[in-house]
């Protein structure tokens, strides 16, 4: 009997937080469910978080436990704070999903910080507009309304009609009596649910802690590439993560801004009047017919190569297989193995501007937008920060496009701002997943059936994905060739290099995209780090600078990793600065070809 009493007390104690905070628990659980349902994308394959209901129960229970152990006077204020934070975050999160098709992101929070009072007022007015009230936001607002009415009924019963009061009182008394009689059963159920939810949610809680423990935004991003990364399934988690991500980027931005203020150029000979850098995306070198691939994916570039002014490089690798990591190393004068971090060094466009070049940046990826994923946020924050953007670029495009060819129209509009000495950077969407969306329908050449003999191990869907990828490369071939044509009659040099490679059913693999968490072996490096690279020179350029073109040709078979690209660019600009290193300049006779090419700071490419 004593044991039964002890068990009864334990069960009662377990259920006590929910009993004391019954209204809080019910409404907050309903809020969690409603926001999850309201932010479920209307897309094929979209589904709710698998552990939504159990983990939500655990989270709500923890909040009620906190309220239970607090003194009553303190508890009232803390509970009010919980209500405000959770309801407000839910409204904003669902509103963002309705308006921007994305829940809260670090970029959204960054954009909020840049709004003025007028824009804030417009946002608040839009929240109460009929179209918003009738959207999924309305469900959250309806729950708030019901919650407020129920709270008013308890505190100010005379506001409620007498018949309603009697009905509510009757229901309440019957419910309380039922709960009193069922207390042992309820205690057992709560304990069982609690144990179950802890076991089911432990992995995500550990993963969330790991995500929130990163020391840099790059580390956080890499954590998100892991297969079992944290699921931020509630608005409040997404808000906290967004604040955390912005805090991490702010630290690196501060260092970059300090470095930018100290940038110095010793001299500049303007060796190349027009330098054009084209940065591609997700380009597996072994899918380029220019490098021996079976399918004719690069006919235009091969034609340029046969004309003798396009020089392809045969042994180039990327230091990472993540765009944001590569971009930081491409733009910074830092190279793998240097002391400190990439953000402790100047960005090469800053040096070009300081030297007197007019710098243009035309991107089809890194413009700040509300629904920007953390990957783009991490890769573009140092390009889009107002101070750093002003330090790097004189001219930028202002909108993204569905297809890369529209960047040429952007350049046509901005070309009038060019000066005698120009650095022009094109950043393409290239072969970024989804491959099918990277080329217009009328420009597609390859079909899934074309790969039956080449890839008999693939099914029809996989062969079509492979065809989509090759069609994206073929379309990219036309885009980069059109960019080259823009400078045919100029005194110009054009460099093409993608950020990293890409898996697309290599060998016997049934996989596309990239394996961020896998150990790097020769096969993976072959697919995800081997990239194409070439340099094209106009006739005017070759005629005036035959020695530079000779250097370009002589370097074509050298081993190279693109973290050192900035040093070659400074050489082409004739820029002498403290951070320039001759041994990292691919075109220099002093270039150190034996420098280790370390992939992801872990693996020596040349020892695989």
Language-model regions, residue ranges each:
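Metal-dependent active-site segment of extracytoplasmic phospho-/sulfohydrolases and closely related
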Residues: 276, 472-514, 566-570
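Transmembrane and membrane-interface helices of multi-pass
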Residues: 1-223
């Amino acid at each position: 009997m004593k044991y039964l009493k002890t068990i009864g007390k334990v069960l009662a104690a377990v259920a006590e937080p929910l009993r004391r905070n019954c209204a809080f628990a019910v409404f907050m659980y309903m809020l969690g469910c409603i926001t999850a349902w309201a932010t479920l994308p209307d897309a094929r394959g979209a589904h709710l978080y698998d552990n939504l209901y159990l983990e939500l129960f655990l989270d709500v229970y923890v909040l009620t436990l906190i309220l239970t152990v607090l003194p009553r006077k303190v508890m009232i204020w803390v509970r009010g704070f919980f209500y405000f934070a959770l309801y407000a975050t839910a409204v904003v999160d669902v509103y963002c999903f309705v308006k921007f098709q994305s829940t809260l992101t670090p970029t959204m929070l960054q954009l909020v910080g840049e709004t003025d009072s007028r824009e804030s007022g417009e946002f608040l007015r839009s929240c109460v507009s009929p179209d918003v009230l009738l959207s999924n936001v309305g469900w959250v607002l309806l729950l708030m309304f019901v919650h407020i009415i129920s709270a008013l009924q308890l505190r100010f019963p005379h506001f409620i009609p007498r018949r309603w009061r009697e009905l509510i009182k009757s229901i309440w008394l019957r419910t309380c009596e039922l709960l009193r009689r069922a207390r042992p059963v309820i205690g057992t159920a709560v304990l069982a649910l609690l144990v179950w939810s802890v076991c089911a949610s432990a992995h995500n809680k550990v993963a969330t802690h790991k995500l929130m423990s990163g020391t840099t935004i790059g580390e956080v991003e890499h954590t998100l590439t892991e297969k079992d990364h944290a699921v931020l399934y509630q608005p409040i988690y997404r808000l906290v993560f967004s604040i955390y991500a912005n805090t991490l980027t702010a630290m690196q931005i501060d260092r970059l801004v300090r470095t930018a203020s100290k940038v110095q150029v010793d001299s500049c000979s303007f060796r190349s009047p027009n330098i054009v850098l084209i940065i591609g995306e997700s380009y597996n070198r072994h899918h380029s017919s220019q490098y021996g691939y079976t399918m004719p994916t690069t006919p235009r570039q091969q034609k340029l190569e046969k004309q003798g002014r396009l020089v392809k490089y045969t042994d180039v690798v990327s230091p990472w297989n993540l765009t944001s990591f590569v971009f930081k190393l491409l733009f910074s004068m830092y190279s793998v193995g240097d002391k400190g971090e990439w953000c402790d060094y100047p960005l090469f466009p800053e040096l070009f501007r300081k030297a007197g070049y007019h710098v243009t940046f035309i991107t089809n990826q890194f413009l700040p937008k509300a629904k920007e994923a953390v990957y783009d946020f991490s890769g573009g924050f140092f390009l889009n920060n107002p101070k750093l953007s002003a330090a790097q670029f004189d001219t930028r495009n202002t909108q993204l496009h569905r297809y890369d060819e529209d960047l040429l129209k952007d350049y046509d509009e901005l070309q009038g701002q060019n000066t005698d000495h120009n650095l022009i950077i094109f950043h393409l969407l290239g072969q970024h997943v989804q491959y099918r969306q990277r080329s217009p329908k009328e420009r597609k050449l390859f079909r899934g059936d074309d790969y039956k003999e080449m890839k008999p191990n693939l099914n029809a869907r996989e062969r079509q994905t492979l065809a989509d990828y090759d069609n994206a490369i073929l379309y990219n071939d036309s885009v980069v060739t059109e960019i080259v044509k823009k400078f045919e009659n100029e005194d110009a040099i054009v460099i093409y290099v993608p950020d990293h490679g890409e898996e697309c059913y290599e060998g016997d693999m049934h996989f596309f995209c990239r394996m961020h968490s896998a150990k790097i072996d020769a096969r993976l490096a072959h697919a995800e780090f081997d990239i194409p690279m070439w340099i094209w020179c106009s006739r005017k350029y070759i005629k005036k600078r035959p020695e530079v073109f000779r250097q370009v040709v002589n370097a074509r078979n050298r081993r190279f990793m693109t973290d050192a690209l900035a040093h070659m660019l400074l050489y082409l600009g004739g820029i002498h600065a403290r951070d320039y290193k001759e041994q990292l300049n691919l075109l220099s006779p002093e270039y150190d070809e034996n420098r280790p090419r370390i992939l992801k700071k872990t693996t020596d490419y040349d020892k695989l």
